[in-house]
Amino acid sequence: MSLKNEEQNDLSPKDSVKGNDQYRAPSGIHLEREEESRNDFWQFEPSNLFRHPRIHLEPQEKSDNNFKKFVIKKLEKSCQCSSTKAKNTIFGFLPVLQWLPKYDLKKNILGDVMSGLIVGILLVPQSIAYSLLAGQEPIYGLYTSFFASLIYFILGTSRHISVGIFGILCLMIGEVVDRELYIAGYDAVHAASNESSLVNQMPDKTCDRSCYAIIVGSTVTFVAGVYQVAMGFFQVGFVSVYLSDALLGGFVTGASFTILTSQVKYLLGLSLPRSAGVGSLITTWIHVFRNIHKTNICDLITSLLCLLVLLPTKELNERFKSKLKAPIPVELFVVVAATLASHFGKLNEKYGTSIAGHIPTGFMPPEAPDWNLIPRVAIDAIAIAIIGFAITVSLSEMFAKKHGYTVKANQEMYAIGFCNIIPSFFHCFTTSAALAKTLVKESTGCQTQVSGVMTALVLLLVLLVIAPLFFSLQKSVLGVITIVNLRGALCKFKDLPQMWRISRMDTVIWFVTMLSSALISTEIGLLTGVCFSMFCVILRTQKPKASLLGLVEDSEVFESMSAYKNLQAKSGIKIFRFVAPLYYVNKEYFKSVLYKKTLNPVLVKAAQRKAAKRKIKRETVTPSGIQDEVSVQLSHDPLEFHTIVIDCSAIQFLDTAGIHTLKEVRRDYEAIGIQVLLAQCNPSVRTPGRGEYCKKDEENLLFYSVYEAMTFAEDSQNQKETYVPNGPNFSSD
């Protein structure tokens, strides 16, 4: 054994004199000079008596953070004019130019063609059905899916996501469309009573109701696309981090109830005004039950038959998706069968069923959005833009991670933004990625974005040739297709027990967002969910977990004594961990929980002062014959510990209030003879702490590990016990 090891063993706690591991307050302290009872622990400099040398790190030189220089440097980099710079800019904005020349035809073409055809077949009935949800004619849903698939092929970086119509966005578009139709006077029920107030708001009479509806829808889509491109340009994609999985899940489920409610009138064949605004779900159900006696029996029977076919087949597709090479396109079969039955059975003429009506072929001339509508729909477009890009970016990143490639979040925002801006000139409404169709696309062998071109070709065939054949298709069939596609969101309730076990807070966020989205409105529900989530984040840091730590045997690791067994508590030392940032919100909680788990220095100090007042007075006669009063302070009971080590590893940052709190805690404890050490401080805590918490010559109060702080506390206590004499100290005035 080396001499160094022998010295360390000689000074180990096991061999120390009894009582050296606990702090015992000096018994003799002058009453009138209580401030001298404070122990300047920082004065115990490292010496050869300490077992472990202190760690000293030299910080990196701080870079020049001059904002003006930073902006100039960025502008110089962005404004460089060269062929390489121009090429990189173009290739970065149009990713298709990068990957298409490298396309492996033999390896990828079969999977891309198969997946594109299947998704296209599924999109035909869904596009027609979701058009009703958006308050549009069926042809506009086909336009939307066609242009979105084609544009994302050019601008997108994800190989697997399917961009097209999404039910939640269609619902939000439909609510804006209904409101603007009512304001413009197209609602015959309310037009007469509001005639005087609508004189200046009526659109050109050459534009009928469906024409004005798509003008409103395309205008909202244009504004939402501009927002998304702006977010990509200014790189504010961080907004999506406030939309947690629990929040998005609750929002989608709540909005699904609203979608389901809006489709009930089609299932029953009722002609009802579409409710919008706060409480629309409840209002719609009231209208349904008031008019239930007007149910069209033919539509009801058709709806039930379609449900009996669609639901079991969808379940079979889900259960046997690993064995099926492609999902059964049951929706297309149902649409074809229902159209044939309606046409040859003359259901519209005989029973008055509601049908899709004329669907034109080809494309309409492009038309600019209504610029006068933009101020009225600008606020509505914000929520639509955020939901659209959040879902698109999250899905693209999820599938990229699954298949081992990378996507550019900002480019995805550009892509989805232009998937809305460009189609808005071609009578389209808002699009985004959709999970259900993306899963189908992936499972059927999709390899690259070429799959989107095949989907667009299928839709183009329908637009040019097949669309008029859906004239006799009942709207009840489209309503059933919409409702059946909501089953994934509505089945989220079965995941709640597992979510509750994992995180109760996330479950509460899910419920609050779901209920507010369903019972109030989709926009207010989203806002409520975001605000409540942020409140929960603050709540988690306001009263975070805090615990005393113990040493794991035969290691230098410390863990919570309330969570693990067989941990060693070091005599005379309390190690405290606070699992949250220390800032103005939780500074009082930090003090209260620290005092509760150790001791309250304010109360101890008060007790010491109270005991000090009980002093022994005795009169003595000096040699000069003058009486003098000598005060003697009674020795206090020794405290259980002499050091508190605060583990700062989980404290991400400090604000001014947090620094003042640490200074106050240190001052209070040192007033009763207990030193406070900080350990495992990250740079964001250590840098402000070094300047505010302690002076320059007190930097040895900050440690890089809890174990280092513990050994310093033991050694400094041993050194102090060596130099501080025991026994009462009588001081006379």
From Swiss-Prot:
Keyword Metal-binding appears in the UniProt entry: no
Modified residues (Phosphoserine): S12, S16
Example of a GO biological process term: chondrocyte differentiation
Bilayer topology: Multi-pass membrane protein
InterPro entries: S04_transporter_CS, SLC26A/SulP_dom, SLC26A/SulP_fam, STAS_dom, STAS_dom_sf
Region of interest: Disordered: 1-37
Post-translational modification: N-glycosylated.
Entry GO MF terms: secondary active sulfate transmembrane transporter activity; sulfate transmembrane transporter activity
GO cellular component, one term: apical plasma membrane
Catalytic activity: oxalate(in) + sulfate(out) = oxalate(out) + sulfate(in); sulfate(out) + 2 chloride(in) = sulfate(in) + 2 chloride(out); oxalate(out) + 2 chloride(in) = oxalate(in) + 2 chloride(out); bromide(in) + chloride(out) = bromide(out) + chloride(in)
UniProt xrefs under Pfam families: STAS (PF01740), Sulfate_transp (PF00916)
Chief location of this protein within or outside the cell: membrane
Similarity comment: family membership: Belongs to the SLC26A/SulP transporter (TC 2.A.53) family.
Name this polypeptide is given: Sulfate transporter
Species the sequence originates in: Bubalus bubalis
Taxonomic path: Eukaryota, Metazoa, Chordata, Craniata, Vertebrata
